[in-house]
Every structure is written in C-alpha cells, then in structure tokens.
Amino acid sequence: MALRAKAEVCVAAPWLSLQRARALGTRAARAPRTVLPFEAMPQHPGNRWLRLLQIWREQGYEHLHLEMHQTFQELGPIFRYNLGGPRMVCVMLPEDVEKLQQVDSLHPCRMILEPWVAYRQHRGHKCGVFLLNGPEWRFNRLRLNPDVLSPKAVQRFLPMVDAVARDFSQALKKKVLQNARGSLTLDVQPSIFHYTIEASNLALFGERLGLVGHSPSSASLNFLHALEVMFKSTVQLMFMPRSLSRWISPKVWKEHFEAWDCIFQYGDNCIQKIYQELAFNRPQHYTGIVAELLLKAELSLEAIKANSMELTAGSVDTTAFPLLMTLFELARNPDVQQILRQESLAAAASISEHPQKATTELPLLRAALKETLRLYPVGLFLERVVSSDLVLQNYHIPAGTLVQVFLYSLGRNAALFPRPERYNPQRWLDIRGSGRNFHHVPFGFGMRQCLGRRLAEAEMLLLLHHVLKHFLVETLTQEDIKMVYSFILRPGTSPLLTFRAIN
C-alpha cells in the first residue's frame, strides 16, 4: 500500500496479518510532566500529496486501520497527522476519550463529511444530526432522543425487532431441516443484511417488507447496492479537497450522487406512506419511530426526513457486519458459544413473554457484542473538533484541532485488554464497575453518541438470542478474516458458516 518504504509506515500493511495486528501494543514511554507545545508532538511520516495520490490510485484506503495501528506502535499513543485540512491529532487511549468528553461544549463539533453534505446541498435536502453542528444540531438532537434513544423508546420498538428476529430464526430453521443432515452451510451475509433492513424498516416506519424468508424485492436489492456504492465512493472522496476531486474523480462523484438518489428515494417512499396514513387517521397503538416524530410535530417534515434518511442508511451495514463477525467468532470458539446458548435458553421463557427483558437477562450475550466491537469496530474512529484548548498526553492541543480516536488500536491495546487477540466476552463482566467507562465507545460518547445505538443493539442482541437457541454454529475456518476499511470497517470476505439444528 505504501509508495515509499521509509516515508509511509503502511508499507507492510496489506500483508500484515490480522493476528499480528491484534497483538501489537503501545511501546510509548511515560510522557514528561511539562506540557509540551503542539509542534513537539510526533508526526505521522510521509508526504500528504503522495498519500492522496495513493488513495486516488487505489480507489480507497482499505488498510487505514492497519497503517494507523502500526503508527501508534512506532510513535506512541498520540501523533499529528497531515492530510491538508485543519490540525489533526490521532489518539487511542481511553483516558484521552474521557478528557475529550470533559471539554465537550453544548454543541460538540465534528468535521463536515463533505461528500455527504455536497449531495444534500446540490439536491436541496436538509442535513440530519450526523452532519449538523452548532445550535441546529442541538435543537434536532434533543427532539429526537426521546423517540429513538431513550429507554422508553427502546421498550416500544424492541418487540417489533423481536418479531423480525424470530422470523429470521424460523426461516433459517426451515431451510436447515429441508436438508437430510439437519445442517446447512452457507454464506449467511445476504440474509443478515435482509434482516437488518427488515428490522430497521419496521422499527422506523412500522412496515414489514417481506425480506426475511422470502426472495428480496428489486427495490431492496437496489437499496443494498446503493449503500455499498455510497460507502465506497465516500472513502474515495472524503480525503481530498472537493476542488481537486471534482476534476480527477468526476465518475466517482457521479456514482456517489446516484447512490444517494436511490437511498433517498427508498426512504422518501417510506415516509410518504406514513404521512398519508396519519393524514387519514391517528393510530391507536405504537407504529414506529417516524410516526411518533410526525405526530409530535416538534420538528419540521424536512428535518424528520433528513434524520430518517440518516437512520435508514446507517442502520444496515453497521449492524449486519458486527452480527456476521459475532457468529464467526462464536463458530470458532464453541466453548464460548455454548455458555451463551445456556444463557439464552435459561432466559427464553421470560423473553418470549416480555421481549424487553432481553436487555437485562442476557448480560453475557451483551458482553459478546462488546467483544466483537472491540475487535471489529464498524466505525473505525471517533472525532471531535475541540472548542477549547486542552492537554492530551502532556501535549498542548489548541482549540479548533480535530482529534480522532482510533478504536481499532484502542481495542488491541494489551495494557487495557490482556491477550487482546483472544475472543473473551467474560472480560467485560469482570471489569464492570471498575471505572473503565471509556474502554467501550464504539457508538461514540457524550451527547454525540450514535443516535441509532439502541436500535442497533436490539437488532444484534435479539437475532443472536434466537439463533443460539435453535442452532449450533460451526466453521472450518480458524484463520482471522482480513478486515478492510470502506468508510466502515468490514470483512473483506464473508465466511461460510454451518448451522446445525438443535433437537
């Protein structure tokens, strides 16, 4: 991946095995007590123009996570990174995440994701909270939280997700039992994607799409393809100034806009259905998140559309890939899988009667999801544009600096997680109440944590609960799966898994 062996630390990244990358630690010496100036901070080696040329030539930045992990080893837990924009600092320790939260203002600021914003400006669409900053962000966020993120909201949409998870398990069981051996080996990734679309669509818009156990519609397949193109083109464009990329990558911009057109059309159709139904009669029971937002009318219709679009686009890949990697890790760690199965079976009757109890009666399964996201953080980094000066690792960080927290390296720090290469959900139960609040931050922190976090957690928890009750999950593959960065961190290949029915 590197252009020069000395200038770019990513020279070995494409061939660096995940097993080796997991075991890398931080060899940084203890920082001196005197606060050092920003300019004294170690800097990521290499020429930024060569790096941009490399991204353009390779049509992406697939090994970003390995490159940055290697750089942390060589430079320590903090360094500067120059991509031509504002001052940028990379960190990977929980203590720095905590300091970032402590200095959060009323309007915690993120960098503008230019390709996404450019599309919305060009098409005349509003931005949702993922893309907003300042007072408008806070106004929207405070009115979205009660119906999307609050415990009360979770209690309302969780039974809807549970119904889809049950259907997924039953559809899979039907396929397995059609085989005389009582087992089925398949690439389950497409089915998981259909599940996440179905569950999210039901929770958001109150409508079943018939994707689970049935052949997907052309509209759903087009939506999935559009998401893939959108994420890939985002990486190809996000590291370059628009003034440059519009000239050297016009085809990518065209693909990016066409993908968003498809995504917006999909989401807009869903919202229009709800809007028309509400115009005729007020529902007597809960019919989903978007209906509640429309009924309350605390946000404009355009703002509800904008935020619904972000939730729709952000609720598929980001949930499906952690689910796939959890199933893979449980398949190659059968002892862990059996313990989780026992927990699910013990709680089955209670959860069947009250699906909401899944959030409290499956602590080890919740820990398994934390362990998956430690090893495979679907969002590679968190970011803040700090509003005031602060000190990180004894270096002065001026206001206006972009600070990025790299979760891939945080999760593989042996000083924080002994034997970090080992898949061990129990470690999360062992550290509960130990004050390590910032060891698990895959959904962000503070007021800017992921708005769809609780929906994603419910979808993952319930699917795994129902699958573990009915199937042994096996794999012949013991080797690590190569992960690639494509705006989200995803497996480069999908593992074949065997589902064996439990009598």
Curated annotation (Swiss-Prot):
> Which residues are listed for heme binding in this entry?
450
Co-factor requirement = heme
One GO MF term: iron ion binding
Binding of 21-hydroxyprogesterone: at which residues?
381
- Describe which pathway this protein belongs to, using the record's wording: Steroid biosynthesis
Q: Which GO terms describe its cellular component?
A: mitochondrial inner membrane; mitochondrion
The record's Gene3D superfamilies line, in alphabetical order, gives: Cytochrome P450
Q: What is its EC number?
A: 1.14.15.5, 1.14.15.4
Induction line? Expression is induced by angiotensin II, potassium (K+), and also by cAMP.
Give a brief account of the tissues where this protein occurs.
Answer: Expressed sporadically in the zona glomerulosa (zG) of the adrenal cortex (conventional zonation), as well as in aldosterone-producing cell clusters (APCCs) composed of morphological zG cells in contact with the capsule (variegated zonation).
Here the transit peptide covers: 1-24
In the record, the note on similarity to other proteins reads: Belongs to the cytochrome P450 family.
Q: Relay the record's extra comment.
A: Expressed in aldosterone-secreting tumors and in adrenal glands of patients with idiopathic hyperaldosteronism.
| Disease per record | Corticosterone methyloxidase 1 deficiency: Autosomal recessive disorder of aldosterone biosynthesis. There are two biochemically different forms of selective aldosterone deficiency be termed corticosterone methyloxidase (CMO) deficiency type 1 and type 2. In CMO-1 deficiency, aldosterone is undetectable in plasma, while its immediate precursor, 18-hydroxycorticosterone, is low or normal.
What does this protein do, in the record's words?
A: A cytochrome P450 monooxygenase that catalyzes the biosynthesis of aldosterone, the main mineralocorticoid in the human body responsible for salt and water homeostasis, thus involved in blood pressure regulation, arterial hypertension, and the development of heart failure.
Name used for this protein in its record: Cytochrome P450 11B2, mitochondrial
